[in-house]
Amino acid sequence: MLNLCDEDFDAMELVEGALALNKAINPETQLEWAHIELARLLKEAELALVHERDEKARFEAFLRLFYQEWGFSGDREAYFDSRNAFIDQVLQRRKGIPVSLGSLLLYLGHKLGFPLNGISFPTQFLLSLNWSGERPIYLNPFNGEIVSQHTLQAWLVGHKGPLAKLKPQHLQSVDNPTIIGRWLALLKSALLREERYTLALRCTDLALTFVPDDPYEIRDRGFIYQQLQCHQIAISDYQYFIEHCPNDPAAELLKTQVNALSHDSQVTLH
């Protein structure tokens, strides 16, 4: 189990928190190898950039190293593959999604002295590059490209509708616990999609250590238990959701599901 609180996550680099999360979900996560690989990449970056004195040129060289020489890229073919959210597998495959690639860039960038911050934009994870005395530059970790205000506005409209307006709060830096919470939700969704229910159950159990009475997490846990043929526990979780969210559209559907599962249990017992 993940014995870390919000303060622990804030005290470490995002990629370190993600690795701890990955290990708690899947014990086969190659934690030690990942730390060794991160140290190797950092050493290689330090050597590659040692003669570059101009900070902006140094950062551009860092991006070229990351995306071109090391070959990291966004996984366009299987974006929702759970491997894109396990850091050890991102390091092995050189493929990921914005939050996993962004966490690597943040880790290496901070060690190299670059002023980078993570931003949980409504559509995806972004990085802001904050040179002293200048307006922030926003980077898409999926491909390393600069994102204009116009593009950010277009993304927001596509996500929230034609009346959406880009506001300063959309581009504020976010703390590690918030990102880790969203990372956990992303992993759970990917594992459910892949029907890897035992690992998905670990995600839900972890989420419930942070929000113990969240009816939506308990509903999701019920669904997972149902897939694992643990019908009595599934019924209990569904009933909890129905009692606490009676006006949710899912409540009526779950009542039908509870009746069906109860009937199946009675038939099995007889």
UniProtKB/Swiss-Prot annotation:
It holds the Pfam family TPR_9. InterPro entries: SirB1_N, TPR-like_helical_dom_sf. Belongs to the UPF0162 family. PANTHER family: F-BOX ONLY PROTEIN 21, SI:DKEY-261L7.2. This is UPF0162 protein VC_2176.
